[in-house]
Design a protein with these regions (language model features):
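Cleavable N-terminal signal peptides of Sec/SRP-targeted secreted and luminal proteins
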Residues: 5-23, 45-48
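All-alpha RGS (Regulator of G-protein Signaling) helical domain and cognate RGS-like helical scaffolds
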Residues: 22-343
Length: 343
């Protein structure tokens, strides 16, 4: 009986080693709550009603060039935001970042400063974990299509996020804001970053023409917009709730202050709104709900690289680094504002 029990423990130990080894080889954390995999109807082969292969190829592109030379730099600039989102979400969910999950994608850039695992509830953890892993795919897709740039030095410390919120409110919050202390704090911090990616992709779309580049941007924009919508939706569910320990300051006020800060730093008018607005700014000027930030025709706002850098640097000046990029963002576009060579 004892030998049988020992044998069972030995087999269990071997299975554990194998599963852990497989996870390490892939580099990705494993979700232990996923059900046992079985054949899925989602991936079943689809045939035409005539019994042959269904025609699934898109029509031929009007522009016969996959990636045009002038497509490269705007798409590489986007990697600055993708790196930032990836590191923030991965560390928040798993306590590790690209250097542990996909080290080849960092292209030799320095690790982020101050990022750490957040104290998240189950639902928020699942959302953030998925977003983080999605960002890994985004970085890989951009690098595969237009080439990469090294990950810049990214400041994701509680101190930096505290400065962001102090800048948004115009005074020092007491205690300083820390995104890693709770699910709500992490969601509010997440409100700061992904929306800018949407603005950037909308602004980039008119200036690229290669069919592969256009396809890449559309795919990125779709998922980035969905991520922002989920984050805003989760915050909207709590819009009237006070954010502890800040007395009567509500979730809605936090989003309004952050959006106003981004407009102020961007210096190009209103391109950002919180989760509630005056009815005159709502969809068709008929509603004060603002789960999705959009213009008068309910279209996404566009921002230029210069606008984005003014906001991300927290300086209002694309020539003066700081904020999330203390040494400046990377790529030829960002470095040109600093009078430096391409990196």
């Amino acid at each position: 009986m004892a030998s049988s029990h020992a044998y069972s423990l030995f087999v269990l130990f071997l299975l554990l080693i194998c599963s852990c080894s497989e996870a390490l080889l892939r580099g990705h954390p494993v979700d232990p709550t996923c059900p046992r995999e079985r054949p899925s109807s989602v991936v079943a082969t689809v045939s035409s009603r005539h019994g042959g292969e269904a025609w699934c190829q898109p029509p031929a592109p009007h522009t016969p060039v996959a990636v045009l030379p002038y497509d490269v730099e705007p798409m590489q600039f986007a990697l600055n935001l993708e790196y930032t989102e990836a590191e923030f979400f991965l560390h928040g969910a798993f306590g590790v970042g690209l250097d542990q999950i996909a080290p080849n994608l960092a292209l030799g850039g320095p690790p982020p400063v101050g990022a750490r695992k957040a104290d998240l509830d189950e639902v928020t953890w699942r959302v953030i974990a998925e977003f983080g892993l999605q960002e890994v795919g985004h970085i890989r897709a951009i690098q595969r299509t237009v080439g990469g740039i090294p990950r810049p030095l990214i400041d994701l410390s509680a101190h930096n996020f505290g400065r962001v919120m102090d800048t948004a409110f115009g005074y020092h919050l007491d205690p300083p804001f820390d995104p890693y202390t709770s699910s709500l704090d992490f969601l509010l911090a997440s409100y700061v970053i992904p929306y800018l990616g949407i603005n950037g992709y909308v602004g980039t779309n008119p200036i690229i023409d290669g069919y592969e580049t256009k396809k890449l941007l559309a795919g990125l924009l779709g998922v980035e917009a969905a991520q922002d919508a989920v984050l805003r939706g989760l915050l909207f569910e709590r819009l009237g709730a006070a954010v502890p320990p800040y007395g009567n300051i509500t979730v809605a006020e936090f989003t309004d202050r952050v959006s106003a800060m981004r407009n102020r730093l961007g210096r190009c008018g209103v391109k950002d709104e919180g989760i509630t607005v005056p009815r005159g700014l709502g969809a068709e000027r008929a509603i004060c709900t603002n789960v999705l930030s959009a213009d008068g025709d309910s279209l996404s706002y566009a921002r230029t690289p210069a606008e984005l850098l003014r906001i991300l640097y927290l300086t209002g000046d694309e020539h003066l680094p700081g904020g999330f990029f203390p040494e400046g963002a990377n790529g030829r576009i960002a470095r040109s504002f600093l009078g430096k060579t391409h990196q």
